[in-house]
């Protein structure tokens, strides 16, 4: 079955559906690596990507963003000069009630009889202003981290923004951007 458009699953309008012991045939997570680069490194800044409204992000989008950002940072910064972390996990099980279409669909389709749906994928539920991912780097690589966050934001079905934090966790976005990169 083809992958449905992300706009169908992005809204947080239904209750959470995460109890896997009740779900037959729930798919496994596609994203398995959450820490990339140098996790033990000591870095000056953290560039974090936040979502601007409550949303569900499918695991396909998270994995696409992870691959894109990791490849970009490895190429431009080097493996030991950054720590990239995905901060959400896809717990939400997405369901679909497949509707029969075409000639004589009424003969074999169920319509709205038992319409609960079958599991088709997983998604991460995010609240407003929640961090999706973070990239820790030193000052000389800050522009690459910001570009990586921008590239990741393109993969998500919601408007995102980034913030720059220092080691203590203080928001220094305006200070850094006013000084220039």
UniProtKB/Swiss-Prot annotation:
InterPro entries for this protein: Ribosomal_uL16, Ribosomal_uL16_arc, Ribosomal_uL16_CS_euk_arc, Ribosomal_uL16_dom, Ribosomal_uL16_euk_arch, Ribosomal_uL16_sf
Gene3D superfamilies: Ribosomal protein L10e/L16
GO biological process: translation
Domain of life: Archaea
GO-annotated molecular function: structural constituent of ribosome
Keywords, comma-separated and alphabetical: Ribonucleoprotein, Ribosomal protein
GO cellular component term of the entry, any: ribonucleoprotein complex
Alphabetical list of PANTHER family matching this protein: 60S RIBOSOMAL PROTEIN L10
Family: Belongs to the universal ribosomal protein uL16 family.
Protein name: Large ribosomal subunit protein uL16
Annotated source species: Pyrococcus abyssi (strain GE5 / Orsay)
Native organism taxonomy: Archaea, Methanobacteriati, Methanobacteriota, Thermococci, Thermococcales
Gene name of the encoded protein: rpl10e
């Amino acid at each position: 079955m083809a992958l449905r458009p992300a706009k169908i699953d992005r809204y947080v309008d239904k209750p959470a559906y995460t109890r896997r012991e009740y779900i037959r045939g729930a798919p496994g997570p596609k994203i398995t690596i959450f820490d990339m680069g140098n996790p033990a490194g000591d870095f000056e800044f953290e560039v974090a990507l936040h979502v601007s409204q409550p949303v569900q992000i499918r695991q396909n989008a998270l994995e696409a963003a992870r691959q894109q950002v990791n490849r970009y940072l490895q190429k431009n910064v080097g493996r030991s000069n950054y720590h990239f972390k995905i901060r959400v996990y896809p717990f939400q099980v997405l369901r679909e009630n497949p509707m029969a279409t075409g000639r004589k669909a009424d003969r074999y389709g169920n319509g709205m009889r038992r319409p609960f749906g079958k599991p088709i994928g997983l998604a991460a539920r995010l609240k407003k202003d929640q961090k999706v991912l973070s990239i820790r780097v030193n000052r000389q690589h800050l522009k690459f981290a910001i570009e990586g966050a921008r590239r990741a934001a393109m993969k998500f079905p919601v408007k995102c923004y980034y913030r720059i934090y220092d080691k203590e966790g203080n928001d220094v976005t305006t200070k850094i951007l006013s000084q220039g990169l």
